[in-house]
């Protein structure tokens, strides 16, 4: 019965996306510089794990050298106000992959090893949408959307998977190939994870160079605890800084392969982070807050994207964009449309990436932790209201004018009650949609190793 239900769901989704794809040529990227017909663009999404806003050279780091990421910005676009949709890892990833607020999937906190919850089967992921448009799909690295069989990448549109089911600070540190544990990575072995993932990425793009592909590379660093190969360490230097530079060098090997294969002009490459810094060593560039908080330092992260001939080189935009915008952006870029059977919170941000066409947002950006709306940002991006929740606790709402005070140092709620009232009303509207469920924090009682690996059959 389960197989029949899954087959029916897949058939319905394929039909929905096929019809949408047929109609898309008339309307995708309306008013913008739509890529010409021809080969669908390859999509490479590269994620750092808890990288602070200023810890990339092109964002002003005085101590960290990142020529690979800087090169993406030089040859493409850099967003100065790109936001993640949640303050912690698991729901942040849900938002990107579904184009929806994480609470719609019932995930509003970090998933733990052997949690009974994970990414629901009825969510349509970016991988599924692109797969149904003819893409090969591969996930590499940190997943963190559930480690039980039904929640793994190969059940959510990815043809293959090599990576870790959760963060490096959660035991045991397991490496999974598709649906089975293939290794446990203590100490020195964990130091080689980044290189191993990039090796796999290079093999993947080489093997799939003649068809459109979606490569999802989710690095496990610079999330602590950090272990690096001896050759990547600098005596006396913070390991966090070495880790970011190591990630940059390893990612450079993938971009070199894409260039060598002649795929650069057919590939959009995005690099960003899932959250702000967890480590005190992370530099948010004067922005307040860290992971777990909806202050700017916890949710504003680096974002650079390259697509030669489509995204102008050297472009910089300060228009607010949020992670769930990337689902419709990339689906439209691939020639499809988002399904019409559910609420999508994101919108096509292609005009922001290219500087061509109109982009306006009608609704505020909203952050939700558990069943609390923690912050609201008005569509233009000036006013940000904090309501508490998550790691932040305070008695009264706080209002900040980000145009004048991006560091959120001066609460102006008492001077602008009209703005507080308007954004509070917006928060209440969202709160009506927030289900009274959220991720359960289960202890590690039956880790994957104890089951001899994970099977999807």
Residue ranges and their predicted role:
Residues 1-3, 447:
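Residue-level detector of intrinsically disordered terminal segments
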């Amino acid at each position: 019965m389960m197989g029949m239900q899954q087959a029916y769901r897949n058939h319905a989704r394929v039909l929905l996306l096929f019809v949408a794809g047929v109609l898309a040529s008339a309307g995708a990227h309306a008013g913008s510089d739509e890529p010409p017909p021809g080969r669908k663009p390859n999509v490479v999404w590269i994620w750092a794990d808890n990288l602070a806003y200023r810890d990339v050279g092109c964002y002003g780091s005085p101590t960290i050298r990142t020529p690979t990421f800087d090169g993406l910005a030089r040859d493409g676009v850099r967003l100065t106000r790109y936001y993640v949709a949640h303050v912690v890892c698991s729901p942040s990833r849900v938002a990107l992959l579904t184009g929806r607020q994480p609470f719609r999937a019932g995930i509003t906190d970090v998933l733990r090893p052997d949690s009974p919850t994970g990414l629901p089967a009825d969510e349509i992921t970016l991988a599924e949408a692109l797969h149904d448009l003819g893409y090969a799909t591969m996930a590499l690295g940190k997943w963190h959307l559930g480690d039980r069989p039904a929640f793994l990448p190969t059940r959510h549109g990815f043809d293959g998977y090599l990576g870790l089911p959760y963060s490096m600070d959660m035991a045991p540190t397991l490496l999974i190939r598709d649906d089975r544990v293939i290794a446990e990575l203590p100490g020195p072995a964990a130091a080689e994870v980044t290189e191993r993932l990039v090796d796999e990425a290079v093999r993947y793009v080489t093997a799939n160079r003649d068809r459109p592909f979606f490569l999802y590379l989710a690095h496990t660093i610079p999330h602590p605890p950090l272990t690096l190969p001896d050759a990547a360490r600098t005596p006396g230097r913070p390991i966090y800084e070495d880790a970011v530079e190591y990630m940059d060098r390893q990612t450079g090997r993938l971009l070199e392969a894409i260039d060598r294969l002649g795929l650069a002009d057919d590939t959009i490459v995005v690099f960003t982070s899932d959250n702000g810094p967890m480590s005190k060593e992370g530099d948010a560039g004067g922005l307040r807050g860290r992971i777990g908080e909806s202050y700017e330092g916890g949710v504003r992260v680096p974002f650079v994207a390259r697509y030669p001939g489509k995204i102008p080189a050297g472009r910089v935009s300060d228009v607010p964009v949020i992670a769930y915008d990337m689902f419709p952006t990339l689906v439209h870029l691939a020639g499809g449309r988002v399904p019409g059977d559910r609420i999508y919170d994101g919108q096509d941000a292609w005009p922001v990436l290219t500087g061509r066409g109109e982009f306006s947002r009608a609704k505020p950006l909203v952050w939700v932790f558990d069943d609390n709306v923690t912050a609201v940002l008005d569509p233009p991006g000036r006013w940000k209201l904090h309501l508490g929740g998550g790691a932040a606790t305070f008695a009264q709402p706080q209002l900040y004018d980000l145009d004048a005070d991006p560091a959120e140092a001066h609460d102006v709620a008492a001077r602008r009650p009209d703005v507080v009232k308007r954004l509070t009303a917006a928060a209440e509207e969202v709160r009506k949609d927030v289900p009274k469920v959220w991720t359960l924090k289960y202890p590690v009682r039956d880790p994957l190793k104890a089951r001899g690996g994970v099977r999807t059959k």
